[in-house]
Amino acid sequence: MPLNKDIKKVLVIGSGPIVIGQAAEFDYSGTQACEGLKEEGVEVVLINSNPATIMTDKKVADKVYLEPLTVEFVEKVIAKERPDSLLAGMGGQTGLNLAVELYDKGILKKYGVNVIGTSIESIKEGEDRELFRNVMSRINEPVIQSEIVTDMEDGKDFANKIGYPIIVRPAYTLGGTGGGIAESEEELDEILALGLQLSSIGQVLLEKSVKGWKEIEYEVMRDSRGNCITVCNMENIDPVGIHTGDSIVVAPSQTLSDKEYQMLRSASINILNSIGIKGGCNVQFALNPNSFEYAVIEINPRVSRSSALASKATGYPIAKVASKIALGYTLDEIKNAVTEKTYACFEPSLDYVVVKIPKWPFDKFQGADRVLGTKMMATGEIMAIGSNFEAAFLKGTRSLEIGKYSLEHKKFRELSIEELKTRVISPDDERIFALAEMLRRDYRMDKVAEITGIDKFFIKKFRWIVEEEQRLRLSKIDDLDKEWLYKLKKKGFSDKGIADMLKVSPEDIYRLRNIWRINPIYKMVDTCGGEFEALSPYYYSTYDVYDEVEVSKNKKVIVIGSGPIRIGQGIEFDYASVHCVKALKKLGIETIIVNNNPETVSTDFDVSDKLYFEPLTEEDVLNIVEKEKPDGVILQFGGQTAIKLANFLKEKNIPTLGTTADQIDMAEDREKFDELLEKLKIARPKGKGIWSVEDGLEEAKKLGFPVLVRPSYVLGGQGMEITHDEKELVYYLSNAFQKDKKNPILIDKYLMGREIEVDAISDGEDVLIPGIMEHLERAGVHSGDSITMYPTQNVSKDIKEKILEYTKKLALGIGIKGMINIQFIEFQGNLYVIEVNPRASRTVPYISKVSKVPIVDIATRVMLGEKLNDLGYGVGVYKEPELISVKVPVFSTQKLPRVEVCLGPEMKSTGEVLGVGKTLDEALYKGFIGANISIKKEKGTVLATINDHDKEEFLPIAKKLHSLGYKFIATSKTAELLKEEGIEVKQVRKLKEESPNIIDTIKNDEVDLVVNTPTKGNDSKRDGFHIRRAAIERNLGVITSLDTLKAIVDIKFKEIKDETLYIFDLSN
């Protein structure tokens, strides 16, 4: 069935900000879908609130609206643009929920908008737990014994009937949000109450736990004629009970018999046919490891995290094919874009193994509860490809950037076998290392399989790796012969991993490899197991005989990607990498990307000329460089992951384009940077690097408290803190020196000033600043967690001139060619520099979109030797636009148990939204709504606990809230303060006092908003920490910065109405 000619203009809903459970995979699928629609001559209108995405670029859709993803704003776009169709399945859970709401409220009918692809009825059957269960029983597909409940009593009755443990799954939520496994009635009370609150329809499925069964997924495509293919099946190494987003996943499945494979494949197709899916769908099964019994867990009637993985694992462009199916094409009419000979109805065949390992944010949150369960906690993931499971797994382990090149982890060596057992029975992100340690101590394989629920097939593979590691540990380098080294390399061991075990340097192993000619060859991912030639291939390394890479003689550049999404290094860096590649291609240069993240646009098959899906380690990158012999390597756009390779590449005499390794060092090494600032006569907050607790105390005495302390060479403010007295400083320093004895700790005088930031481009002679950005929160809140305003609202002309002068001096002083990011503080009329990053930063996509300056494109051309004056955007500070744009951070702390919520110098946000308006108030209003910060709620109760040095500042804000009709609950001192000002307040007992106390007030739903300015951020023993956590877990707003609170209250005061606001198409 060819293209439906009635479809002329399609609205695509994006997935909004990156949160745990919904990351970069929807930028990848959304971009692919928009391109698929445009290829067919269809006009595409996009709404998405996330500025850090490729899909919101002006060339991806015809009209781009960076507006809040709410029914009100989507309706505005529909009313203005009048699309005839809506494609709902590309924006993750956010997009689906919005589409259902638009349908239910009659908005789609009112404007005559048809849903294309999977229908709303089918989406509901897939998402609504009750409808889904009814469909399954109608077609005789087994589901787990379960009950749908909408209140607490029914939930308890069901649990008592079938016994604990019980799995709680709320309807219409993301990444297992609000769900969990309840082992007792007390746990059920807590999980069920939250689940009912977070489900948009107040509905929760309680099901009998089949913890320990295998979890298997099928990624299936179906068209309107009922043709169905399975793109890929995947096996979770971790059993049911750990969310699939937190599981290690392998494709294709390794332990299913042919009968099991076919049985679940038939079930998947049966389910898609009965629900009437048109497009892609993910089906999850629980399979009893001891029989052929299985049960359907759930389906995702949309593209998902798993479909991004399946796409990258097979080379089959699921989102693009789904967009064509939505236009009316059938699978046998859609060409496979990788081969351009075969059609989309060919099932991909894999002659390799793919492993996905999640990337968790626990390095950012030391006190977090790391135990994995049904609620997803990973921020991102890596994918590794190998010719065998061991190779893919070891590649995956080193791709995580956790400093692990083997399965050995020092901290598990000290544990007893009982302690190790506990670590694998309640598995956390490090469970594989605990499991390896058990195997190292000859613990029986069948016992390990029994207590972990991991199939013996995988345990055997892990044991082989452990045995080889032990053998290496007991050997000397002279014992390593050609045959053994070849076998280790074939199974994925890295030079560094082998060297560490033999106590030699990686260089020694590299030398032996070169003598014996043990070098990797590269194989192709081509969707068809090599049966047809692929026109846009990507590659993985293996130690086989036949090499499939054709190396050209063209001028070529390698761009190093940024690896997995994590807090501090998110999708913004993928945005920069992709734009760099596009700029190089425009200049006729062959481009090669190296990256390992399956969720991103940069690893899509048709972005670069060649893609290497490899770990971003020294060895793996060097192998590719030696193979391709590029004219240069670009590191500036891959965040800290890429920058870390600068010194290594310099040692190997490999040319890097743009800023050199020595120049990077000048910006990142504290002493060299201080010398430069002195030479340039640029002020910075006083401070220095210290090597002991005693030095620190002495320096703090000189500077005067408060002081800012942090490790050197970090990303996203990791390990930074503001300390107010000696006790706090000693606590911080003793911990910091314990973690890292090799580098100094930096200690600065903390200035409570206005923070200002620039991303600039330098060609070695001039600089261009696309825009000066101002932070709403004062210095001390990490720039990635601050609300950012552009153009600036409170910065004088003199200071702006000084910013340009300092930026130029610094860029030329360091010798920057390309990007530089500088953060300033304005304090009492003076300008200080607090940080310089010699690379692209996370604000690049935001400032590119709102200033309309193609920053990455210009920076790339400058790195290749062009001059700013010839590129059409001039030099100096670029002219300011009329519209005001704010970037508002979005947090995922609710999904991470026992994690600090409080804003401070260490970054915590996972994503961001954009608010665009004619005035700052309008922009902030949209930004807050986009970030799901409640500003519409009329009246309510504020729980306030304010520390002493913030009380004076809090009063005028409290008075404003009071005049808006808000009631107050407060602890003794804050209550006294409010009473003195004539504000009515209910006093509540402190945490240490008897019930009912402050936590009970939160748990009894007496509060709508918590305002808590912390006395000491990161110590979870403090009351403030428990108050903030209790509030976040009840889905309440928690505000810890008075600057943010003041902005929210000012906006509430203005009483802005949705209907009076304009929406802006940013595509022109």
From Swiss-Prot:
Q: Where do the annotations place Mg(2+) 1 binding?
A: Q284, E298
- Amino acids binding Mg(2+) 2: E298, N300
Q: Which GO terms describe its cellular component?
A: cytoplasm
In this chain the MGS-like domain maps to 933-1068
Binding residues annotated for Mn(2+) 4, in chain numbering? E835, N837
Gene Ontology biological process terms, A to Z: 'de novo' UMP biosynthetic process; glutamine metabolic process; L-arginine biosynthetic process
PROSITE patterns in alphabetical order: ATP_GRASP, CPSASE_1, CPSASE_2, MGS
Q: Which residues bind Mg(2+) 3?
A: Q823, E835
Q: Where is this region: Carboxyphosphate synthetic domain?
A: 1-401
Question: What's in the keyword line of the UniProt record?
Answer: Amino-acid biosynthesis, Arginine biosynthesis, ATP-binding, Ligase, Magnesium, Manganese, Metal-binding, Nucleotide-binding, Pyrimidine biosynthesis, Repeat
UniProt xrefs under InterPro entries: ATP-grasp, ATP_grasp_subdomain_1, CarbamoylP_synth_lsu, CarbamoylP_synth_lsu_oligo, CarbamoylP_synth_lsu_oligo_sf, CbamoylP_synth_lsu-like_ATP-bd, CbamoylP_synth_lsu_CPSase_dom, MGS-like_dom
Q: Where is this region: Oligomerization domain?
A: 402-549
Cofactor (UniProt): Mg(2+); Mn(2+)
The EC class name is ligase
Q: What terms describe the molecular function in GO for this protein?
A: ATP binding; carbamoyl-phosphate synthase (ammonia) activity; carbamoyl-phosphate synthase (glutamine-hydrolyzing) activity; metal ion binding
Which reaction(s) does its UniProt entry say it catalyses? hydrogencarbonate + L-glutamine + 2 ATP + H2O = carbamoyl phosphate + L-glutamate + 2 ADP + phosphate + 2 H(+)
Residues binding ATP 1 are: R129, R169, G175, G176, K208, V210, E215, G241, I242, H243, Q284, E298
Q: EC?
A: 6.3.4.16, 6.3.5.5
Q: Where does the chain bind Mn(2+) 1?
A: Q284, E298
Segment Allosteric domain: which positions? 933-1068
Q: What is one Pfam family matched by this protein?
A: CPSase_L_D3
Task: Give a short account of what the protein does.
Answer: Large subunit of the glutamine-dependent carbamoyl phosphate synthetase (CPSase). CPSase catalyzes the formation of carbamoyl phosphate from the ammonia moiety of glutamine, carbonate, and phosphate donated by ATP, constituting the first step of 2 biosynthetic pathways, one leading to arginine and/or urea and the other to pyrimidine nucleotides.
The free-text domain note is: The large subunit is composed of 2 ATP-grasp domains that are involved in binding the 2 ATP molecules needed for carbamoyl phosphate synthesis. The N-terminal ATP-grasp domain (referred to as the carboxyphosphate synthetic component) catalyzes the ATP-dependent phosphorylation of hydrogencarbonate to carboxyphosphate and the subsequent nucleophilic attack by ammonia to form a carbamate intermediate.
Protein name per the record: Carbamoyl phosphate synthase large chain
Q: Which organism is it from?
A: Clostridium botulinum (strain Langeland / NCTC 10281 / Type F)
Instruction: Kindly list the organism's lineage.
Output: Bacteria, Bacillati, Bacillota, Clostridia, Eubacteriales
Name of the coding gene:
carB
